[in-house]
Amino acid sequence: MVAKAKEKVKAENVRFDMADLTKRWNCEDGAYDFIICNLVLEHIKDLYDIFSEAARTLRQGDKFFINELHPFKQYQGTKARFERNSATIEVDAFTHHISDFTNTASASGFKLIKINEYWHAEDQNKPPRLVSFLFEKA
């Protein structure tokens, strides 16, 4: 996914890093001005360390964007999966409620700027597929 992102974004002021998010991030305090986590936090049991590191590596007013499988889909049994050699592989996932994101963000020094829910066009009357949060470091 990092390689695909690098293909799409050529700006010199954008840096893509790949690391184990559950460990201390290999960067200085205030090193970033915008952090994106896309469909990754459902695979991490405890959100606090992630938010804590995001707070450490952002400056006041900087943003933290999260996009995840909506917990409503998880309540229905939907899991992350991918295809490999014609086999479907299900990936371990943890259900994080909306309040888990907002409360952990608040405890880590973030304020919620925006929350959005997303559906496929044909699923407008069903639970949302994705949820995104935009937080700002207070």
Where does each model-flagged region fall?
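Conserved SAM-binding loop
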Residues: 5-6
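Conserved SAM-binding strand-loop segment of SAM-dependent methyltransferases
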Residues: 10-26
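A short acidic, Gly/Pro-enriched loop at the edge of an enzyme's catalytic core
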Residues: 25-35
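A short SAM/SAH-binding and catalytic strip from SAM-dependent methyltransferases
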Residues: 33-47
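A short glycine-rich, Lys/Arg-flanked "PGG" loop and its adjoining helix->strand segment in the class I
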Residues: 48-63
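Conserved class I S-adenosyl-L-methionine
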Residues: 65-95
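Short alpha-helix
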Residues: 93-115
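Core SAM-dependent methyltransferase catalytic element
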Residues: 122-138
